[in-house]
Amino acid sequence: MKKKALAFAAMACSVAMLLSACGGSNSNAASGDTAGSNIITAYNSEPQNPLIPGNTNETGGGKPVDLLFSRLVSFDKDGKASNEVAESITPNDDATQYTIKIKSGWKFTDGTPVTAESFTKAWSYVANAKNAQKCSSFFSAIAGYDDLQKDGLKGDEQLSGLKVVDDTTFTVDLNQSDSVFPIKVGYSAFAPLPESFYKDPKAFGEKPVSNGPYKLDHWDHNKEIALVKNPDYKGNEQPKNDGVTFKVYTDDSAAYRDIQAGNLDVMESVPAAFTKTFKTDKKVQAYSEAGSVIQTFTIPSSLDHFKNDEEGQLRRQAISMAINRDQLIDKVLNGNATAATEFTSPKTPGYSDSLKGADNLKFNASKAKELWAKADAISKYDGQLTFSYNADGGAKPLYDAIVNQLKNNLGIDAATNPIPTFQEFRDAVTNRQMKGAFRTGWQPDYPFAENYLWQLYSTAAADGNGSNDGDYKNPAFDDLCKQAAAASSTDDANKLYQQAEEILLNDLPAIPLYYSNASGVASLNVKSGYAFAWQNLPTYTEMSKK
């Protein structure tokens, strides 16, 4: 999420865009909704940025953005894509050009129509480096993207690969074949935007004009984001409730207690204090199934002694082998996760637990010490390695345990570095202020390996242009991902993505820890529709109190 940077609850918080703070009820988080209404109240963190689809890559903003904006395609509970705003998405023979026809009659909540230009201008705005949008790299496959990364732009230059044919038709020229493009456009960064956005993007982000199943009622910062049903919505996800109000919490245990008391309806995580008991708690409706979210930590590629060279690779491999993932899952997460074996997830087509280099993710303390000694022979390291995380998200038990394992199993000086809030934490990551390792994770934006790999570790997504927060760069990895995108079949693509992953398993730009279960709780007020979708998020539109 978004999507995005993930929210964490010591157990396995869902992330949709890279990390988002899982919290508990803040003293100013409002309690339940009006008695008898069918408004669903949902747990959330304060978004890092205004609610603009192309600048949202964490779950605090990603959850409301997903419900506010409809894209060309939507995904069902299992991740299957269906046309939504699109009437058709038709490739040419080699999938280097797509002709997209949109359905007539769609309109934004200000009454203006959704047209072909609503998409082409929005995509160009996100791609244009002048506008500094966090999801820019998602558009790197479209012709003209490189031209929009140059200095001296005004911000309104358009992608040359996008051509408007008429009000309901546009074409997309790509830099190379991409058979997965019709799935990618289901990500929120590909949402259309109304003309009012360009007049004042900042003001728009505070009260967006949208086209999705809900529209914004109000955003009371650090308290709640209230969405109400959009009566003009024409798409696939007709809400079975009257709205969703996202309550902002800074203490996830307090949020859980609000679920028990009926003052909050749903949260997509379980605090560490309740992971042993939530499945038998008669005051909540519990959910826990295998999920698609991966939890990791990242060591910046610019960090001395940890760069993408022989010394840095040895140290990263040593750190990874010194971590006993099964013990973390058993003792800290109470069994609500699965040890990571690669960089995607068991829910992703093409997943494998037997890739070359997978041994680097297995606990082996003696091998870890051997690799660390080899790195020291290249250049002695006597520093302290810090592990940063947002203190408002329940991550403390996990990172305390990781630091203790590294001290005991590898004999290095390691320490935690809690940062008070998720917003401060993400700002430090975004501004490249991290001087050590930091917590990361990924909730997929669409169900394909490319989303876990290219969007997180490609050169195109580095340097603030996407979600490559460690600024890892490897041309061989980039090339394999490009070959995979151009493959003629999904099977061929997955084989190439597996080869790309084997490079990551050697270089370890991030250290995979575990796959979070899709776990959460709902209040007893929720009468129907409570389940989790492929992104490890509740099925908000399906939930009802009636």
Model-derived regions: residue spans:
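Ligand-site clamp/hinge motif
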Residues: F197-G205, D232-T277, S292
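Alpha-helical secondary-structure segments
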Residues: T115-A122, D167-D173, G212-P213, N241-G243, ...
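Surface-exposed binding/hinge segments that line
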Residues: S118, A127, N131-P194
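Gly/Pro-rich hinge or "lid" segments in bacterial periplasmic/extracellular proteins
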Residues: D173-P239, G243
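N-terminal lobe/hinge region of extracytoplasmic solute-binding protein
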Residues: Y43-D93, V209
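Structural transition elements
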Residues: T338-A375, G394-P397
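Extracytoplasmic/peripheral linker and loop segments enriched in polar/acidic and small residues
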Residues: I329, D413-E424, W454-S523, K546
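Long beta-strand-rich cores associated with HINT superfamily self-processing modules
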Residues: G520-K546
